[in-house]
Amino acid sequence: MSVIPSPALTIPAGHGKAVRLKAGQSVRVINTHGTQVVDCWAWNAYDLEEYMCMEATRVWTQHLNPVVGDSFVTSARHPILTLVDDTSPGVHDTFMAACDRRRYELLGCTHYHRNCSDNLFEGMLELGVTPPRRNLASFNIFMNIRVLPDNITLATLPTVTRPGDSITLRAEMDCFVAFSACPQDIVNIQGEGDNTPKDADLQILDDAFPSVKVKGPWVPEHLTSAQR
């Protein structure tokens, strides 16, 4: 099947945008300027209590961060999105909480600062949908968080992506997917430049990427051996 992209849908710098996908459709997230972190959340379109869960995803994949072929799973442990293509260096994050108003207060802001937590609702409200609760556990696309050699300490670093780098996520169920072009301009995460948040772009693809199959959950080897 050929890739039929929709016109680019811009996530304005520091703001949110959401899309509804049918199972088998894909969304491409484009780092237009090469420096922007994009937070991502997803929900079952028919049950907003079922949401994409980073904790359950790490158990399912046994990866700290996703690679092509990995699925993100929900709070009910069902695959919801699968990473089917990645033209970036593959540096993303599933650990850091999305920024919220309180985060910026702790960083010294005395006035309201745009944040990913509010952007989640901004994007979904454009679709007429209100998630039942806030979820700080986002998939942080293009964010560069490194585990240091002591295997304990995390380092928050600038992005290593290039202009036009992208990832593509395939919907495994009908779902809402929300994105935030992260407004963070205090902690240096937005590339090696002036840390200014920038636009990112989305494209909806009518392509199921059939060569990328959904993998089952990780199971300890002694259990898989016993089943043979």
Q: Residues of each region from the PLM?
A:
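Acidic, Ser/Thr/Pro
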Residues: 1-228
